[in-house]
Amino acid sequence: MKFFRLIIPCAALMLFALPMAAQKPEQQEKQMMEFIDKEVKRLTDVLGLEYWQEFYVDSTLTHDYHAMSDELQKLQSAKVENTDLYITIRDKWMQQIDDTYKRIFTEEQWKKYWKSGAQRAQKERDKRKK
């Protein structure tokens, strides 16, 4: 169950990141911000984030998801069909988010986050790197 709490946001991100090129920019932005807001709320509820941590999580997700989306759109615009490249970009940005979370969260929050599925996601990213 905990695994799905992490995988569902990642899957949702991929569901809106790849078909974004067919949407209007306003729709893309709205959809991304709704996703980010839900993820911040989820992390706040699960980890008991303080206000300043919520701010940093929101800022991190906003920056990194936009950057990841831009990279994915560039690949899509170039008509790249190699799915491994899309996965590599997603993994790079998810690793960046986890690295930032580790600096933001307390040790207790990090352990809780790590056990809630982040550790499994990290192992999967590590497998794909090999």
Model-derived segments and their meaning:
Residues 1-27:
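Bacterial Sec-dependent N-terminal signal peptides
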Residues 23-130:
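Charge-rich (acidic/polar
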